[in-house]
């Protein structure tokens, strides 16, 4: 089965056609897509799962169900989920403000939203540390609220929010820009309150893009490493996330455990994204 991954798609097309000829445009594009998808996505995932499958079941379960690993699973997914919920709310508000209002500094704010895309994640982590450490600019506020951000779970949450916010804003903005304001005005003329107008007129068309943005943001938060490793203490049972745990295993040359943990994370993440995509499809069908 493994050698099939290395057979060029255009050769398979030749064999099925039974004779040599030039590829059509569709077949050429299909061959390129199969090559790209196979070698960039399918092949690495296949071999990761294949290496994991070679391990005995008792070793798989023992490694995947270690207390430290379970704690990292739970903390990573719960923190990413909380960051996604926060970004869904405030990302929607930010996108609304950028589309519907004019104010000084709007272009600067709009450009700043894309910074997490361009910045190395380690730079993002260093930026967060500079602002939120014990000697940072907001130390008086943190002292008044009696909270510690750096080297604490709150720091991990902030890092995940920082890297995943642009996904929500950028997926909602085009929908808001194409939305006709006449619908809102008509609803107001008929006596609808602002909340009723938003919930029944504006929110339904925004739902697919909001779900897409939050799904992408959730995926990005799950895989974040560079900023978290700087702003968190990375202590097991406290604020250790899966990505940092995997790196620690690799530093210890424990490749077997790292492979097993990565495979379980891959399966869990794929399952979560599968159900989220199902919800998206259901929403689109429902609104049609």
From Swiss-Prot:
It is a multi-pass membrane protein. The chain crosses the membrane at residues 2-22, 28-48, 77-97, 112-132, 149-169, 196-218, 227-247, 257-277. Residues 73-277 form the ABC transmembrane type-1 domain. Keywords: Chloroplast, Membrane, Plastid, Sulfate transport, Transmembrane, Transmembrane helix, Transport. InterPro entries: CysT_permease, MetI-like, MetI-like_sf, Sulph_transpt2. The keyword Transmembrane applies. Pfam families: BPD_transp_1 (PF00528). Disulfide bonds: none annotated. It is found in: Plastid, Chloroplast membrane. SUPFAM superfamilies: MetI-like. It comes from the Eukaryota. One of its GO terms (molecular function) is ABC-type sulfate transporter activity. The keyword Repressor does not apply. GO terms for cellular component: chloroplast membrane; plasma membrane. PROSITE patterns: ABC_TM1 (PS50928). Belongs to the binding-protein-dependent transport system permease family. CysTW subfamily. Part of the ABC transporter complex cysAWTP (TC 3.A.1.6.1) involved in sulfate/thiosulfate import. Probably responsible for the translocation of the substrate across the membrane. This is Probable sulfate transport system permease protein cysT. The gene is cysT.
């Amino acid at each position: 089965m493994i050698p099939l991954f290395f057979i060029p798609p255009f050769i398979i097309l030749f064999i099925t056609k039974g004779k040599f000829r030039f590829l059509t445009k569709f077949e050429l594009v299909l061959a390129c897509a199969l090559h790209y998808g196979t070698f960039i996505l399918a092949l690495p995932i296949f071999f990761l799962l294949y290496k994991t499958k070679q391990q005995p079941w008792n070793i798989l379960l023992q490694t995947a169900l270690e207390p430290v690993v379970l704690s990292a699973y739970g903390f990573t997914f719960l923190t990413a989920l909380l960051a996604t919920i926060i970004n869904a709310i405030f990302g929607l508000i930010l996108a609304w403000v950028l589309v519907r209002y004019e104010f000084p500094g709007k272009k600067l704010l709009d450009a700043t939203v894309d910074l997490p895309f361009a910045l190395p994640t380690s730079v993002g982590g260093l930026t967060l540390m500079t602002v939120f450490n014990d000697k940072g600019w907001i130390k008086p506020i943190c002292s008044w609220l009696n909270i510690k951000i750096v080297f604490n779970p709150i720091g991990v949450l902030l890092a995940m929010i920082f890297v995943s916010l642009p996904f929500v804003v950028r997926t909602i903005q085009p929908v808001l820009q194409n939305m006709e304001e006449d619908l809102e005005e008509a609803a107001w003329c008929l006596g609808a309150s602002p909340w009723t107008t938003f919930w029944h007129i504006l929110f339904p068309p925004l739902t697919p893009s909001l779900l897409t943005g939050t799904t992408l943001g959730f995926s990005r938060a799950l895989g974040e490493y560079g900023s978290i490793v700087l702003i968190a203490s990375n202590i097991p049972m406290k604020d250790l996330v899966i990505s940092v745990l995997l790196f620690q295993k690799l530093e210890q040359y424990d490749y077997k455990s790292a492979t097993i943990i990565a495979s379980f994370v891959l399966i869990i993440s794929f399952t979560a994204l599968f159900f989220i995509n199902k919800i998206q499809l259901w929403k689109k069908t429902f609104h049609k």
